[in-house]
UniProtKB/Swiss-Prot annotation:
It comes from the Bacteria. This is Gamma-glutamyl phosphate reductase. GO terms for molecular function: glutamate-5-semialdehyde dehydrogenase activity; NADP binding. Its EC number is 1.2.1.41. Keywords: Amino-acid biosynthesis, Cytoplasm, NADP, Oxidoreductase, Proline biosynthesis. Pathway: Amino-acid biosynthesis; L-proline biosynthesis; L-glutamate 5-semialdehyde from L-glutamate: step 2/2. It comes from Psychromonas ingrahamii (strain DSM 17664 / CCUG 51855 / 37). It is found in: Cytoplasm. One of its GO terms (biological process) is L-proline biosynthetic process.
Amino acid sequence: MDLQSLGKLAKEASYELAITGSEKKNAALEAIALALEANQDKIVSANKEDIQAGKEAGLTEALLDRLLLDETRLAGVVSDVRSVIKLDDPVGEEFDGKLLENGLKLSKRRVPIGVIGVIYEARPNVTIDIAVLSLKTGNACILRGGKETIRSNIVLVEVIQAALKSVGLPETSVQYIKSTDRALVGELLKMDDYVDMIIPRGNAGLQKFCKENSNIPVIVGGIGVCHLFADKSVDQEKALAIVANAKVQRPTVCNALETLLVHQDIAEEFLPKLHAHLAPMGVTLIAEEKAKAILGDKATLAEAGDFDREWLCLNLGVKVVADFHEAIMHIRTHSSGHSDGILTNDFTIANKFINVVNSAAVYINASTRFTDGSQFGLGAEVAVSTQKLHARGPMGLQELTTYKWIGIGENLIRP
């Protein structure tokens, strides 16, 4: 596969997208939504082939769940596409305007980034999310999904390209690297003549490889070792409901809860309640020594490294901490910087938690599952960034733009 040609075509498409108005971009998104509905059987059939191949390859149930794109999930994707249509287009927005003493009218204007390269694993709905948000913001994209969903992704991109053609936009606005040759990832990372930003969505190994080998700015994130700290003042019954939601609702995603820290003053009372509440849901508690002593055979003793793991299943790490300080030190040591929260009725402690926990999303008395583009009102997201530049947290429309300075004068010359 000639990636250089892909890059050149994407760059050319990005120039046209950059000057395409909101009405036409929204028409393209509606065409994509209609095409996804019209091609549902074809898409679901391709996904079933991917699922069957995954089963034959011995993939875990957690990973197979990530691969799944059935009728229900596809309907959710289509709904997300239409939600993005309703969002304001950030491109062209002018802000920080001012008139300088030298007579220059100066402002910033939001513009597309250009060409976005996204390398991702497993979830085929990511293909739609990235394409839609890129198009809405006037960006072209080059996609490289995992081999596990190759059939689903190829069909999805073909559907998208046909929809783009139907409204008069370049099919090459969204392109897919069909080869599963891993060497092509390294080649893509060197294409700084054509690609303006790389977003790897996958495991720590993929993200490390991209950071170390890319000539292009890389946005990392999506690894979620997420924590909740049950403080001594917590409403225990309400806390149980939040913990269950954060862990059980969808354990295979990056905003699922992986570790619960429990203040020692409530541990004897709270941990048995926790087990009674979660065990019927299939949750296995992985406990450090103090928690294990309280829970006995109702928990499995944690091993070295367990509190650094993104379980992506119904395992939940549990640790008893002496106080607020120990909870913070544990989070600083083991959190991936994705989403962490505190469950408490002491809002002095809650505000202190917000100030000292350095994660992309920090919660008071809420589930970590809220860290999501649609839940944040952003529509779908291309990624959840855990770094501080250029974006942080769910990356929606605004995070897929940059800005340029606009200076307007009346035949001004610099004094």
